[in-house]
């Protein structure tokens, strides 16, 4: 529930907003063992937005969706820091069903972009403007790029202007690039991590 999520954001992260764990029991209490996956609150906030888009119910938007979306965005704001490169980077977190701690985790960066953009749209649709709106806009405009890695030549070979897969189920298929999305920067491992290994 939103009240429990607000309490947990304050208690666990010392921040405003709402935190919802990957595992939550039926009464709305979060499991504290999954507190490093930060994306569930964003996922739920986006469901609220989709419901509003489907129904165009302004009462639902102002009474239910916007409070939840705003609290999700407030929490997500605390997960990012603007570094010397001028970009907002995701602090320590984990990806889906994971335990490896990442900086600039793929899921956190993707959900940040979509959540902050959605929060700004929801506020506009409701005729509301919060003090945080400018911060969220700045984050969206200066968000760290998605984490990517270049694959080895044994996996993808450049052939003229295109690339072909050299192994796996789709061997021989043409692909756009020899770069793939990474999970993020492994804090302990000190390297970009992927679910793929050559």
Stretches found by the model and what they are:
Residues 71-126:
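Acidic/histidine-rich catalytic neighborhood
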Residues 28-30, 94-100, 179-183:
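Flexible glycine/proline-enriched surface loops and loop-helix/loop-strand junctions
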Residues 4-5, 23, 71, 79, ...:
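Generic marker of "main functional regions" within proteins
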Residues 1, 33-55, 63, 106-113, ...:
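Active-site core of glycosidic bond-cleaving carbohydrate-active enzymes
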Residues 1-46, 52-55, 59-64, 68, ...:
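Helix-terminus loop motifs that line ligand-binding clefts
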């Amino acid at each position: 529930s939103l009240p429990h999520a607000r309490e947990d954001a304050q208690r666990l992260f010392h921040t405003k907003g709402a935190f919802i764990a990957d595992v939550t029991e039926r009464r709305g209490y979060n499991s504290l063992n999954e507190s490093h996956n930060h994306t569930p609150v964003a996922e739920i906030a986006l469901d609220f937005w989709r419901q509003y888009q489907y129904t165009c119910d302004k009462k639902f938007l102002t009474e239910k969706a916007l409070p939840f979306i705003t609290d999700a965005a407030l929490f997500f704001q605390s997960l990012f820091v603007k570094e010397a490169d001028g970009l907002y980077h995701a602090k320590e977190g984990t990806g889906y069903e994971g335990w490896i701690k990442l900086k600039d985790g793929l899921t956190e960066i993707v959900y940040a972009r979509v959540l902050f953009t959605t929060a700004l749209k929801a506020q506009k649709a409701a005729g509301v403007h919060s003090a945080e709106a400018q911060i969220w806009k700045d984050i969206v405009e200066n968000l760290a790029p998605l984490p990517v890695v270049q694959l080895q030549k044994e996996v993808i070979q450049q052939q003229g202007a295109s690339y072909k897969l050299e192994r796996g189920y789709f061997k021989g298929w043409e692909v756009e690039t020899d770069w793939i999305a990474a999970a993020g920067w492994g804090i302990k491992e000190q390297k970009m991590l992927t679910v793929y290994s050559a």
